[in-house]
């Protein structure tokens, strides 16, 4: 079926939004100005210093190393940080962070009041592991400001689960392949710029309602006159699920007009994967997936998992030679840096 003809209500559609908006205040944990420099890799002034680093994954408070962090560490990339005039020792992770910028906190509390959210009595910065190089410290600082708010839209009220203040990441300028591995170059002008993060409840009724909700949130933020304007200053992340699928987060939607179509394409993808899974299960003589994943039967799914392991041998083959004439820049760079292309056979899939 065409994505435009799908009925959200009949399919058990659920959707929520996460809005990330830059504030027009100073940086969140340093007293540096939040100025962005419109320069590319070939325009960096010669007097801007550079620092080269490597990041290594370490145990968090749980005593375990994050899976994503371990994966990034295995890539053995190095990072070069260009020190812009509005970055200092804190941005370089060579000095401890300062307390929250007062104007940024005031903006977050103002936005909370406009959404009837309930502020927390204390502000406690939390740390989220980030080892892709976009944070010199290896983590992003996030502070929960308020909870349990709401915003009115043409299709009804949408709950606001949380409002947070967090640091924006460093801005990537280039990725280069060298004999010793991949080198990623960042500029520190954007690192530490305060972001207001607003996460809605899954109260969005339709793909079109998602656009209306994003528009209402954007207009409310602009009314504060405390937010930055322009391309890249706001980002919408979409959380979408159907009864027959899993929740999927679609990151970085910049254009509001794209939101309904992006969501409908994700709905169609989840339906396609559901039908394909049941087609493969039928061929293997296995029970089908229920149309509502909340009705999943754990013993049955364990049986399906064991059957899949026995049917798919997961024998790996090096097919790097088949990609030596690829026109993909990403593949060319990867092969030049010593990477390989690995493939496995999926019996019974027939190219599906």
Regions inferred by a protein language model and the residue ranges of each:
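Basic, nucleic-acid-interacting segments
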Residues: 1-352
């Amino acid at each position: 079926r065409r994505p435009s003809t799908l009925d959200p209500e009949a399919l058990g559609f659920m959707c929520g939004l996460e809005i990330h908006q830059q504030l027009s205040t100073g940086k969140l944990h340093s007293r540096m100005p939040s100025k962005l420099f419109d320069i590319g890799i070939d325009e960096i002034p010669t007097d801007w210093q550079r620092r080269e680093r490597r990041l290594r994954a370490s145990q968090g408070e749980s005593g375990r190393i994050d899976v994503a962090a371990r994966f990034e560490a295995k890539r053995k990339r190095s990072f070069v940080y260009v020190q812009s005039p509005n970055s200092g020792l804190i941005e370089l992770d060579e000095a401890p962070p300062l307390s929250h910028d007062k104007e940024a906190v005031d903006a977050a509390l103002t936005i909370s009041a406009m959404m009837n959210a309930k502020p927390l009595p204390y502000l406690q910065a939390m740390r989220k592991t980030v080892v892709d190089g976009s944070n010199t410290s290896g983590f992003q600082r996030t502070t929960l400001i308020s909870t349990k708010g709401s915003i009115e839209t043409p299709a009804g009220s949408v709950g606001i689960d949380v409002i947070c203040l967090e640091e924006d990441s460093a801005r990537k300028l280039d990725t280069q392949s060298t004999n010793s591995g991949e080198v990623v170059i960042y500029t520190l002008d954007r690192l530490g710029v305060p972001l207001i993060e607003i996460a809605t409840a899954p109260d969005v009724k339709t793909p079109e309602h998602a656009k209306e909700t994003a528009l209402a949130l954007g207009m409310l933020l602009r009314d504060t006159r405390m937010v930055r304007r322009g391309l890249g200053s706001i980002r919408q992340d979409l959380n979408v699920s159907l009864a027959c699928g899993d929740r999927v987060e679609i990151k970085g939607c910049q254009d509001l007009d794209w939101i309904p179509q992006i969501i409908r394409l994700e709905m169609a993808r989840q339906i396609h994967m559901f039908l394909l899974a049941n087609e493969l299960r039928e061929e293997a003589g296995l029970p089908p997936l229920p149309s509502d994943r909340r009705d999943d039967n754990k013993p049955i799914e364990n049986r399906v998992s064991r059957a899949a392991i026995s049917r798919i041998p997961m024998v790996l083959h090096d097919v790097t030679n088949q990609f030596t004439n690829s026109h993909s820049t990403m593949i060319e760079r990867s092969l030049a840096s010593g990477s390989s292309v690995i493939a496995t056979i999926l019996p019974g899939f027939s190219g599906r």
